[in-house]
Amino acid sequence: MADGGEREELLSPSPVSPAKRQCSWPSPQAHHPRGSPGAAGGGAGGVGSSCLVLGARPHLQPDSLLDCAAKTVAEKWAYERVEERFERIPEPVQRRIVYWSFPRNEREICMYSSFQYRGGPGAGAAGGAAGASPAEEGPQPPPGAAAPAGSAPGGVAAGASPGLGAGAGAAGCGGEGLPFRRGIRLLDSGSVENVLQVGFHLSGTVTELATASEPAVTYKVAISFDRCKITSVTCGCGNKDIFYCAHVVALSLYRIRKPDQVKLRLPISETLFQMNRDQLQKFIQYLITAHHTEVLPTAQKLADEILSSNSEINQVNGAPDPTAGASIDDENCWHLDEEQVKEQVKLFLSQGGYCGSGKQLNSMFAKVREMLRMRDSNGARMLTLITEQFVADPRLTLWRQQGTNMTDKCRQLWDELGALWVCIILNPHCKLEEKSCWLQQLQKWSDLDVCPLEDGNYGHELPNITNALPQSAIHSPDSLSRPRRTVFTRAIEGRELHWQDSHLQRIISSDVYTAPACQRESERLLFNSQGQPLWLEHVPTACARVDALRSHGYPKEALRLTVAIINTLRLQQQRQLEIYKHQKKELLQRGTTTITNLEGWVGHPLDPIDCLFLTLTEACRLNDDGYLEMSDMNESRPPVYQHVPVAAGSPNSSESYLSLALEVALMGLGQQRLMPEGLYAQDKVCRNEEQLLSQLQELQLDDELVQTLQKQCILLLEGGPFSGLGEVIHRESVPMHTFAKYLFSALLPHDPDLSYKLALRAMRLPVLENSASAGDTSHPHHMVSVVPSRYPRWFTLGHLESQQCELASTMLTAAKGDTLRLRTILEAIQKHIHSSSLIFKLAQDAFKIATPTDSSTDSTLLNVALELGLQVMRMTLSTLNWRRREMVRWLVTCATEVGVRALVSILQSWYTLFTPTEATSIVAATAVSHTTILRLSLDYPQREELASCARTLALQCAMKDPQSCALSALTLCEKDHIAFEAAYQIAIDAAAGGMTHSQLFTIARYMELRGYPLRAFKLASLAMSHLNLAYNQDTHPAINDVLWACALSHSLGKNELAALIPLVVKSVHCATVLSDILRRCTVTAPGLAGIPGRRSSGKLMSTDKAPLRQLLDATINAYINTTHSRLTHISPRHYGEFIEFLSKARETFLLPQDGHLQFAQFIDNLKQIYKGKKKLMLLVRERFG
């Protein structure tokens, strides 16, 4: 008996629930049908009597006939039915039924106490085989199928070795923080106490041990159960989660592992029935006294109702008993907190994919699949709750109103939701009324405006441009006229599918089903030439059947149907190949083909290929009977597979499931299929392909798998319209680059010729290659270009091109040192890759591989890198590319590694590769640099050859673009007098044209630096004539050039200065600049820095005489004009600055002999003209009188 605190919790009043069914009893005069009162396990002592303890039997002792019968009854029948069926039930029988009614398998406890249950895809098989869930009342295999082996209840039975239970627990969950693991630790630490089973009710206390921060806490736990399922749980910890807390787990495992230590009583109504009136009165009074503060109001209320003849309580026979199990009409399913499921899903959706909510929702979907495998009715129940929250997501309305698509993460969750509903609708043992109810609900959700569409769009996009073109005849009709297909449409369409077909039943029920010796005409299509059964159905639909079988715990049946589907695909492949051979000549002449598969299998909403692949590989997994081993860090180890022969007696028995898995994956990935419409659909194709390839990479290729791989690759290469690797493909078929990269890497060690042939064939990207003939409508599959944007349908084109580049890079790496293969790969790259950036990446990759730091250079691959670089130069010569300079520098580096002949070649053919600026400033300059000479160890003739080519290039570039190349040409030609003169003349001739003053000044400074001052003066004079410096441009960048030009002319002599000053006066109108020039010219005598041989006069120049007089007058006039200009818009805060300006002007005015008179007259004029500016004029008087 539990202590008083236990009873407080369990006896709190509540309305009658399924766990507390009405228990009736005969009148006092009636005969007691269950034997004498003393026959009950508790004896006449009732509450105070000693409890009956069940002894443990020897571990290997077989169950008695009583136990066998009690097990079956406890699993299948509600206890009320037992009571109705038999007038008298002996007490030992009652005890054994109550005993065996508790769940017997720890796997089920783990499933309801952890998201991260470690049951892998094969767990359904294990669960079904172990009888882990006697979930449904008599679950049957699909019609015609054999029941799963060992379907009798078993699992971890009572009395089993505790070690086995611990193993199951360890194999069941990963991660020390999970409730199941924590429950095991609580159980192992002895924290479970006061365990009492009263009928179908288990109670006990669980103590959380003290920690450094928290004291020990004891929680009261109560569990109700019925027919080997836990139907309700209560724990004092107040757990708010979808699944059971660690305390419920600990108590449940205690009952499973230590049944001999649990005090067992029959339902409390049985004990009460054995008491006489005095005992009952004593029992009630003691109970009220022990809990008077809690139950006294309820007790008085019940007493009043019982004493009232008209009360409702007296209208019903019997009274509720929470320990008597469920009634016949109660639904028999495991306890699932529906409100918590709703709240958790709502919370995860509100987080919008952040905080790991996507992973949590995926875990919930995985839990649904796990329940389906265990044939637990809560799977569909939980999925319904999840779907209701998904449909109520407020973001759906927002996305629809804005006409935007939902996020990829959310879209993937919706896809999984739709796929799960397909599995549920195709449940092979689904009752018709259940299926009808689900279909009604699905139709209701599908009719909602916010229900996401199957293609990932909301239909607000403009009609696809390709729908109006001739080639769109192969597509479905315009999106505006298409039937609306939501994520639930596939599941709703499942209403037409059934399992009653006799051929289908024979396929899934027998491994040895073959064609009969005498076939009727209607049966010939059902078998291939070897007598193997075929299943002729739409492939994704057939695979959905496989998924449904697999998901509902029928792995053998799923395998049989999978083999039949693969035999069908093989036959279709063979027939299409034969048809293609007859049409091959015509198709090759046309250069185009039709698509036989309008609906691709990879990226399909039903994911058919992945379904078949997983079904087959699950049968071949080695580790832990199909369970995915997980570390405590939840990191999965890659699965290990072995060859498992197809079931003995099968026509396919010479093959293994693993080879079939590889074959069907290759078939699906190699299928030629149209690129679907819409960004999400295209992205899904790429994502699913990569997922399937990652699973293929987990297979260790042995001889048998290599043979399968070779055979299928040959079929794909020879294939016609069904193969994406055939000789002719449709221009809008999905490229095979990613798939071919896997095939190339897998085949290379075993069959290099086949691997290269396949990879080279896959390099195609027809949607780009046929664009040149886009205007040609003679072929029905050519697209007319009616929009300026490039290929508007192919949203993932960038990703596809990058995968094409990866394939090419893989081939280049593998072919290192093989000249013939490298040449073939180079030609394929040049023909099929159309992105200059990607070709440049390939060139860089080839260069890195060809020039390793720890070994010698590979010249063949280096030449390939150079060829690719040259192609990039030609492709980007007339287009804008922000990486162009990087590309040019890299090409020169690559050519340098190749050798001097490569440098000479690019110098001589520069006009096809570079702009004049690039050729002179980067290419030629690098080619003749000291670093290059040392790197190549060039001798004198080679250096001269390079220099000659560089000079020729420089002159050609200078002629073509003198503005940008004149200076570079002079630099490159400075060591050759004739070439230098030619470059100089080009610069002079161009000076009168479009060259700017800054360009001319730069060249002039260079000429002075090289010792040609007169030529520098000539260029500076030309530059001065192109300059115009306004009065207020006192910070113009050309001021330094003007000052330098004046200093140059002054250093050359009086005549040069006299020639330049008129140009200065004409071009410069800024007073401060002119005054600065004038001051510099008067400080030193002209000609002091002149050329050798020219004599200087040695006298300072006078400002009153030419040529400085003209400069002086211009400076004074500039000051006067600037003064008036500044006074027009002057503000008081600039008065001080203006006075300083006048002070500088006075210095210039005072240079001539009568300068003071001119300045005084100037000031007087200012006072007269601007007398309104009194404050300013006052400052002028104070400073200048």
Swiss-Prot record:
Signal peptide: none annotated. A zinc finger (SWIM-type) spans 219-256. PROSITE patterns: ZF_SWIM (PS50966). Residues 1-45, 123-153 are annotated as: Disordered. One of its GO terms (cellular component) is extracellular space. GO terms for molecular function: zinc ion binding. Keywords: Metal-binding, Zinc, Zinc-finger. Coiled coil: none annotated. Disulfide bonds: none annotated. Residues 1-10 have a biased composition (Basic and acidic residues). Pfam families: ZSWIM4-8_C (PF21055). Transmembrane segments: none annotated. The keyword Zinc-finger applies. This is Zinc finger SWIM domain-containing protein 5.
